[in-house]
Amino acid sequence: MIKKLKLTFIIIFFYLLLINVSNANLQEKIISKLQQVKTLSFNFTQKIAEKEEKGNCYIKYPLLMRCNYQNAKQKILISNGKTVAVIKKKYKKIYYYPIKITPLFTILNKEKILNLIKFSKPIKNGLKVIMFEFNDKQSNNLKIFFDKNSLEFKGWETKDAYSNNVIFTIIDLKTNKTIQDKFFKIPKEEDL
């Protein structure tokens, strides 16, 4: 009985050790791949509560982003590195937010993502997705996921200003395409 117990303990110990080594190796591979990325371009699906929106998006590290939504409001989201602007062209209206108080401050800051991956363990390591979780000083809870096979950035999950779950899924990702900084310029309302 004691021999079986010792054997069981040894098997469990080596299994846990193997999982930790495997996770560390996976994290190193994700970090290596992400370090090479300068820009991302992709289609997306964004689900907020029960509402789903689609569009295309461009990210240039650090902190630049432009997403064009395919909807009746002709919504565009732009981060110029300091400010996030939600533009509703149909209504000729722009809403401004300081980037530092939004989850985009982490998502668009590659160094923050690299540190998150380096210094934390995945909260989920499934068949298709590897997920890391980040909590910041503003109480933003952010889950970032990567494809387990390609190790590419697959999206994120967070909460919006109204505490609705936001799931942002990346589709057809392309990396390191040339994107000019002026593409991320926020227009003036009178120019809409």
Specify the residue positions occupied by each region the protein language model found:
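Flexible, surface-exposed loop/linker segments and immediately adjacent secondary-structure boundaries
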Residues: 90-129
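A short, Trp-centered hydrophobic/proline-enriched beta-strand micro-motif
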Residues: 32-52
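Bacterial N-terminal signal peptides
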Residues: 10-18
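Solvent-exposed strand-loop boundary residues in beta-sheet-rich modules
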Residues: 48-50, 90-92, 162
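Boundary at the C-terminal end of the N-terminal hydrophobic targeting segment
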Residues: 21-24
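Gly/Pro-enriched, hydrophobic low-complexity segments
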Residues: 115-192
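An acidic-aromatic
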Residues: 57-106, 166
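Bacterial N-terminal signal peptides that target proteins for export
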Residues: 1-9
